Amino acid sequence: MAKHKHEEHPEDVEVKETVETAEQAESASPEKSELELANERADDFENKYLRAHAEMQNIQRRANEERQLLQRYRSQDLAKAILPSLDNLERALAVEGLTDDVKKGLEMVQESLVHALKEEGIEEIPADGEFDHNYHMAIQTVPADDEHPADTIAQVFQKGYKLHDRILRPAMVVVYN
């Protein structure tokens, strides 16, 4: 029996070695996991920083685009308010019986208004030729004939205007149908 007490079983040796390697792994593992955690946190912070930086650039870009858009269309409301006055000037010029001086004065006012509008990018919409529903509003139709094909403009009731690529007011027209 004494012999058995001093002998170690091979199974016990394996168990002791396994316990020792597990203890070594545990002591080495916390260091490695702390390093891994620190690296993960650093990667996470870097990712958050990059996302925040990209978001800030997007905000700045959108603000810049909005500022440019506001600058481009800043005169839209003023133009819409002035267009009826321009229409009234055209009607006044169409009245017969005006003296030459009055007519010349009205034409000068009209020209200065049109020039000021052009400087702001406001242009009259051409209303001759073919009807385009993007720029013209048909308020009446008349029958087409040999001289006047369908979908062409017969008469302009009110001029249309656009500011760069925006329609301020479509031209009101009579269309051959």
UniProtKB/Swiss-Prot annotation:
Residues 1-41 are annotated as: Disordered. The keyword Nucleotide-binding does not apply. Residues 1-19, 29-41 have a biased composition (Basic and acidic residues). Its main location: cytoplasm. One of its GO terms (biological process) is protein folding. It comes from the Bacteria. Keywords: Chaperone, Cytoplasm, Stress response. Pfam families: GrpE (PF01025). Gene3D superfamilies: 3.90.20.20, Head domain of nucleotide exchange factor GrpE (2.30.22.10). InterPro entries: GrpE, GrpE_coiled_coil, GrpE_head. Transmembrane segments: none annotated. GO terms for molecular function: adenyl-nucleotide exchange factor activity; protein homodimerization activity; protein-folding chaperone binding; unfolded protein binding. One of its GO terms (cellular component) is cytoplasm. It is found in: Cytoplasm. Belongs to the GrpE family. Homodimer. Participates actively in the response to hyperosmotic and heat shock by preventing the aggregation of stress-denatured proteins, in association with DnaK and GrpE. It is the nucleotide exchange factor for DnaK and may function as a thermosensor. Unfolded proteins bind initially to DnaJ; upon interaction with the DnaJ-bound protein, DnaK hydrolyzes its bound ATP, resulting in the formation of a stable complex. GrpE releases ADP from DnaK; ATP binding to DnaK triggers the release of the substrate protein, thus completing the reaction cycle. This is Protein GrpE. It comes from Streptococcus gordonii (strain Challis / ATCC 35105 / BCRC 15272 / CH1 / DL1 / V288). The lineage of its organism: Bacteria, Bacillati, Bacillota, Bacilli, Lactobacillales. The gene is grpE.
